[in-house]
Amino acid sequence: NAGLRYDKHNFIGKEGEKRITGLGFSTTAGDTIFAARGGLVTEVVDNSASTSENTSFHSTENYLEVFHKDGTFARYKLFQNEGIFVSPGEEVIPGQPLGIIGGENYKQGSHLRFSIYCPDRPDHSYVPDFYLSPEETGKPEERVMYKSWHPVEIIMKEMSKKEKKKFLSKE
């Protein structure tokens, strides 16, 4: 379990409207990032980490993308160079290690940039409700510290019988 601080990443679109395009989670450099959901790894960029100091955004960032069975994609950004453990075409399960986070050269320090999007939406953006605690779901509040937790029943929710058996054999 890790303490995560949620920060909205806004994008200024047409006519100045703002929309949430992702979530930022404070991390410690070198932390392992785990899959939020299972799916197919569709894209990996593993050698483009920014070396600019004290930056807020950079056009080159290491990331990976996972396609989910419901048609959504998750994008995980700011991995260390050569720090991603998975490859395109690989199936991942919830809770599987994906890679080592970087981003310590950013103004906000090391952090994960996480977004979920739907290609069939006009603006592609989508921020789902999260399990904020074992008793509560909803949208996280900006700059509030949340503790991550990974209950087995949630991790296994989308798994096939074969994946569940494999997962439980590691427990």
Regions found by a protein language model. Name each.
Residues H58-T72:
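OB-fold (S1/OB) nucleic-acid-binding surfaces
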Residues N1-E61, P94, Y146, H150-E171:
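Surface-exposed, glycine-biased beta-strand/turn segments
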Residues E17-I20, H68, L78, H111-R113:
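Histidine-centered active-site/metal-ligand motif
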Residues T28, F34-A35, D70-G95:
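Short histidine-centered loop motifs in beta-beta connectors
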Residues E43, L78-N81, G103, C118:
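A residue-level detector for short acidic-glycine micro-motifs
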Residues L64, I93-Y106, F114:
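Short hydrophobic beta/alpha edge segments that flank linear recognition/processing sites
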Residues I84-Q96, H111, S115-E171:
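Acidic, glycine-rich catalytic/binding loops that coordinate metals and/or anionic ligands
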